A protein has these predicted regions:
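Helix-biased detector of long, well-ordered alpha-helical tracts
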Residues: 1-351
Length: 351
């Protein structure tokens, strides 16, 4: 009989890197996917979004007015409370459906779990995730669990959308305003918390942001006819911004002074706190990034910071900006104007 791990225990002690900071670097992932070559290029026409070019989720056209969205996301724990971990992991996985402009139908759990932890811990993770899936309008329909010394949890999510009303990474045009719907800094705050350098209130602020769904923001964008958006997660604001810029063939210019930061995040960044994932993000954007000489180093760190369950980044045509912001305000979705889209070589700038 396996001896159970002493209680109480800390989930974060069982992993070196939690949340979206554990994602494989975008540069290495791109290299791996490039090796697929003709296999990615040979997808059927019904696959609207897949590997070539990549987007936030796979989308398959079923009929003229129905497309099915499929996505998958999981990671090690970044908080110690099991139910909260389940909520955050679920919100993060569900976000890719919303980032495509879809509605959630159902989800399946993906879990890796140490045999020497009490089963009740896994129950709480499942319960947190199930509640969040219900909040998103779907249901948790099953899943698969394996043994693993390092716990991991996430979801495979199936959603639906009208194929002509999808949000995509491409489609941004010069003059569009860049809106962001969640403040930045979850990576540095979680990293700082592991070092005992974050107050309880600041950590609570990060947790509240991470378990907040992007559903209302996506609904507002789709209703306004917005087409260019993504969610900001493990590759950071600049990494995901660069993906949009490349997909659109445009230059994204972010106003560093306008970047919203979660309470405590800038102070930690200024003190040199950074996740391991941030180094991957810096390498990914290095050849396509211009940073203004006057931009504070802490803001550069914040712009590279891997986000877990971050907000939506959208390119809004100027003639729709007022209506979009009104819709977001009615839905009580926080949002910030953080930059603009310009003509020119695809890339990102922090000015």
């Amino acid at each position: 009989m396996t001896a159970l791990r002493p209680s109480p225990f800390r989930l974060t002690d069982l992993t070196d890197c939690g949340g979206c900071a554990a994602k494989l670097g975008a540069d290495l992932l791109a290299e791996a996917l490039a090796g697929l070559g003709a296999e990615a290029a040979g997808a059927p026409d019904a696959l609207i979004a897949g590997l070539d070019p990549p987007d936030d989720a796979a989308v398959y056209r079923v009929s003229d007015d129905l497309a099915i969205i499929g996505t998958l996301d999981f990671f090690p724990p970044l908080v110690d409370d099991p139910r909260t971990f389940g909520e955050i992991a679920a919100a993060n996985a569900l976000s890719d459906v919303f980032a495509m402009g879809g509605r959630v139908l159902f989800a399946l759990s993906i879990a890796a779990f140490p045999e020497d932890l009490p089963a009740g811990v896994l129950t709480e993770i499942f319960a947190g995730a199930s509640a969040k899936v219900r909040e998103a309008g779907g249901t948790l329909g099953g899943g698969h669990t394996i043994r693993d010394p390092e716990p991991k949890y996430g979801l495979a999510v199936i959603g639906a959308a009208h194929p002509d009303r999808l949000l995509r990474k491409g489609g941004a045009e010069p003059g569009d305003v860049l809106l962001l719907t969640k403040a930045l800094g979850t990576g540095v705050l979680v990293s700082g918390a592991r070092q005992g350098r974050v107050s309880a209130s600041d950590l609570d602020g990060a947790i509240d942001a991470m378990r907040r769904l992007n559903r209302a923001a996506a609904d507002a964008f789709v209703s306004a006819g917005i087409r260019a958006a993504t969610d900001v997660t493990g590759f950071g604001l600049l990494g995901h911004g660069l993906e949009m810029a490349r997909a659109s063939g445009r230059r994204f210019v972010f106003d560093a002074a306008s970047l919203p930061a979660l309470p405590g995040a800038l102070e930690l960044a200024a003190a040199g706190i950074e996740t391991g994932g941030a180094a991957h993000n810096r390498r990914f954007v290095a050849g396509s990034l211009d940073v203004g000489a006057a931009v504070a180093p802490a803001l550069v760190t914040l712009a590279h910071d891997p986000q877990t369950s971050g907000g939506l980044l959208a390119a809004i045509p100027s003639d729709r900006l007022a209506s979009v912001e009104s819709a977001l305000a009615r839905a009580r979705v926080a949002h910030w104007r953080i930059g603009r889209v310009e003509a020119g070589e695809a890339g990102v700038a922090l000015a």
